[in-house]
Amino acid sequence: DKACEQYFQDQLTIHYPDHDMLGEETGIHEKGSDYCWVIDPLDGTTNFSQGLPIFCVSTGLQYKKETIIGVVYAPYLNELYTTIKGEGAYRNGQKLKVSDKTELSRSVIATGFPYDHGTNPDHNSANIVHILPKVRGIRRMGSAAYDLCCVAAGNLDGYWELNLNLWDVCAGILLVE
């Protein structure tokens, strides 16, 4: 995680030396810019460490705290998700469309749990008990960024999770919008 984030920061500093950066591993690096790169170098760390294929690199660019560009790359799956605000979302160059389902009972949705679920009292388990009977199914992928990509592509009808940080969802939310 740390080496990957440092690489991103080094490259962004070369090309955009005045831009702010927010990274999962190193926090905020403020330079007083209206632009801020939001970086999650490895979303789905547990999946990666266990040899599971769902993990991503997620990067968003914000202008005055509004996300204007989002990029999520799932390297093992060779899926590149890209979006520019107002121009649609794409997977490997193919335009994406969110699901058109309007009934919760027909929906397959995803969720997640915080990495510290054993000590975090707000760990989402109680919500699943209430929601499961109302939906067609619930999935847990292990990467918030990838879950949002699946919503953007219409593979999932929705997604919720508690206690997320900006780097977890910055690019993915714009893909869905």
Q: Residue ranges of each PLM-predicted region?
A:
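Residue-level signal for inorganic ion chemistry
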Residues: D1, L12, T45, A74, ...
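N-terminal subdomain of lithium-sensitive/metallo-dependent phosphomonoesterases centered on the IMPase/IPPase/PAP
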Residues: D1-L42
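Generic detector of well-ordered alpha-helical packing
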Residues: K2, E25, P41-G44, F48, ...
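DPxDG-like acidic metal-binding loop motif
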Residues: K31-Y90
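Short, solvent-exposed loop/turn motifs
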Residues: T67, K95-K97
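An extended, acidic
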Residues: K97-E177
